[in-house]
Amino acid sequence: MIMNPTAIKHVVVDGHSLTLESFVAIARYNATVELAPSALEAMKKSRALAEKIAAEGRVAYGITTGFGEFQKVAVPKEMSNQLSTNLILSHCTAAGEPYADEIVRGMMLLRANALCGGVSGVRPILVEMLLEMLNKGVTPVVPQKGSLGSSGDLAPLAHMTLPMLGKGEAMYEGVKMPGAEAMAKAGIKTLDTLVSKEGLGMTNGTCAMTSVGALALYDSICAAQLGDVIASMSFEGLTGLRNAFDPRIHQVRGQKGQMLVAANMRKLLDGSEILDNCQKDRVQDAYALRCIPQLHGACRDALDYVREKVEIELNAVTDLSLIHISEPTRHAQIS
């Protein structure tokens, strides 16, 4: 079962407690968001260590080195900011029709939530800006084609970042316009540049595919729930035999989804005057009626499995590199 996301009006983003319902409430139904104080402190510590690593010249991927095949190239501290900004600009290579606003809003939320984990070494202002854009309705225009998938939704996330730099395009109040104009109309100050590590921090994640998947999962769960309602109407119209939903039958089978659907069918058909008053001239129905719990239940079990994996990914940090803080010395370990 799933609760109604429209009942969720406000969500505190902390990096670890996002649910499918709260995700949909923000991405699709425009629930407001705020940054958890604990996440703010974690990001401040992480950023301080990233700056320390850069100042010491330690070898750390994406902080003091280039990217990909250029990982062995040392990057001088004075060039690290430009390198981060260039990473965004160079990866804006997606093509095709733009994603729906709800998918892009989901991407923004997931990127902010991942950065709230406090292991990416970025400034809190990036998360604060993403959340402000969500609250004020500035949605970057992000083309659908061109992601690397599990290696990172690099191109979609680069396009998502452009309006934060006063570039690209965005939707605001239902109108597509230059990103700088949308941000100005919403009263959001843009950034002149990113700083070291932030190019990777904004792009190295699975936020696009997870946003698409989470919204599809929510719609699939809703469809499964409606499937039981439709099945009950068919069952009633064909004057089926309700003993097929006897809980004892499904308890000895032990399948969670099957038991759930059988209970739902009993509830939906309880008090049916048609079934109470019809003549029974058979001992069992056709498979299509008596096996509704087995069929629908298998779908419910599959959706439960997918939900478990999606909700892990909603709160996952998929950045590279990661800065792990060892308390109380606050020594940084890079992975």
Regions found by a protein language model. Name each.
Residues M79, E236-D301:
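Terminal amphipathic helices with adjacent charged low-complexity linkers/tails
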Residues A39-V59, M129-Q144, G187-T193, S321-L322, ...:
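Short, hydrophobic/aliphatic alpha-helical segments
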Residues I323-S335:
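Single conserved hydrophobic/aromatic residue that forms the stacking wall/gate
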Residues E69-S84:
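Glycine-rich loop at the start of a catalytic domain that most often binds anionic cofactors/ligands
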